[in-house]
Amino acid sequence: MSSDPGYQAPVVTVSSSIPRRGVGDSVLIVPVVTRDDAAAVLAAAPFLDKDAVREIEAALKSLGATGGEGQTHRLVVSALPVASVLTIGLGKERDEWPADTVRRVAGNAARSLDKVAAVLTTLSALDLEAAIEGLILGSYRFTEFRSAKTAPKDGGLRAITALSQESKSRARDAAQRATDIATAVATARDFVNTPPSHLHPDEFAKRAKALGEAAGLEVEILDDKALVKAGYGGIVGVGKGSSRPPRLVRLSHKGAVRTRTRGARTGGSKRVALVGKGITFDTGGISIKPAANMHHMTSDMGGAAAVIATVVLAAKQKLPIDVIATVPMAENMPSATAQRPGDVLTQYGGTTVEVLNTDAEGRLILADAIVRACEDNPDYLIETSTLTGAQTVALGSRTPGVMGSDAFRDRVATLSQQVGENAWAMPLPEELKDDLKSTVADLANVSGSRFAGMLVAGTYLREFVADGVEWAHIDVAAPAYNSGGPWGYTPKGGTGVPTRTMFAVLEEIAREG
């Protein structure tokens, strides 16, 4: 991450035609489809003349191109002023193109042009915002810890010209929105990809503060002494084993319409609480994890990263609602001072908990944060976390699980699917609460069963949500971190999920309540 707050996106401009000058080093990205078993140029008019289209299609025919989704070909086209053309396949021709298909193929195109500084594209004629988001997210790279020996010699993608016939004002607003959303996702990725040696709780809090203040947010940070004094037993308990003490960060966007006299929210303005798990590294504590793949636990603050990025995005987009993020941060380490299996701690608000497994630490810090967030009297609460390995077992590496109050849970899942993050609604059966009974405290932090682990964790969190608050818990244990190869606009490493889901929910609440 640079010394400037947050990720620096490529410069985006929108044009109604291909410039005749100044694009000699640029690559033009052109979508093609499968038509009669061959590749055909899509969205050509009015940007490409007939000579350019004929030249492109003739070259593709000679190469045996079919226009299959993700298929790319680099061509030199004499009829165009650009250095080269990259065709990107969309698959079989259709009347309408889903936004995430456009986003995904734009990401594929950007990844195939990783050494190109400037691009133009007609993909934006299909969906302006999706094309810009896909290009920015597909071009993302994390190089902060590369020395001169291995750092890329080029600067990556720095300029995007999106070709569109939208009105100037509409195009300008859409391009800015897309850039802001992609920047938020990339910022969350940067946090996740930063190693725990450089992103311990205090440093994480400082970076969150810098981002928040740059966006005009109100920022509050509680250090370890303040946490002890206020009774945040979950956060303090988890952080006891580390030499790097915990923090609680609060970031507030006050966008709701207020009365002139008392400054109170008007009746139609909503308040949304965001809560994100910020375990900067998770060894499991005394209940230590296996060594294999423990290095992936650098991503155990993926929920916090997404929440911070989302509240900053809400401020940039000036959403007319209040959004208050409550982000607990701790490092879960084994040591002589660490909490032990069998210890009892008191969560913020007074609930006592028997800690049967110190590797179920996320729910302990989240419970504190949820109770604190509910003191702000939100209408809605969204919590997200890399909470359980059971999410991966149940839903795989790309599908978040959403639990919570039924109507709001379904609303979150639906919007997540619309933006391409593809969360799936899951139940919280009442009988699972019995599995969290303790003989010595109000609750145990785990059940005695290996079944339904994702749902049991959600059931635990439900105990701390105030009555009357519509809430959703998004488990992104696997989706927050791509341990495999890149695909679409998703790189290896931090993904930024579920930033776009949460922002989509905030936008809908701002529109509809």
From Swiss-Prot:
GO terms for molecular function: manganese ion binding; metalloaminopeptidase activity. It catalyses: Release of an N-terminal amino acid, Xaa-|-Yaa-, in which Xaa is preferably Leu, but may be other amino acids including Pro although not Arg or Lys, and Yaa may be Pro. Amino acid amides and methyl esters are also readily hydrolyzed, but rates on arylamides are exceedingly low; Release of an N-terminal amino acid, preferentially leucine, but not glutamic or aspartic acids. Gene3D superfamilies: Leucine Aminopeptidase, subunit E, domain 1, Zn peptidases. InterPro entries: Leucine_aapep/pepB (IPR011356), Macro_dom-like (IPR043472), Peptidase_M17_C (IPR000819), Peptidase_M17_leu_NH2_pept (IPR023042), Peptidase_M17_N (IPR008283). It holds the Pfam family Peptidase_M17_N. Binds 2 manganese ions per subunit. SUPFAM superfamilies: Macro domain-like, Zn-dependent exopeptidases. It is found in: Cytoplasm. The active site is at residues 289, 363. Its EC number is 3.4.11.1, 3.4.11.10. Belongs to the peptidase M17 family. Presumably involved in the processing and regular turnover of intracellular proteins. Catalyzes the removal of unsubstituted N-terminal amino acids from various peptides. This is Probable cytosol aminopeptidase. It comes from Mycobacterium sp. (strain JLS). The lineage of its organism: Bacteria, Bacillati, Actinomycetota, Actinomycetes, Mycobacteriales.
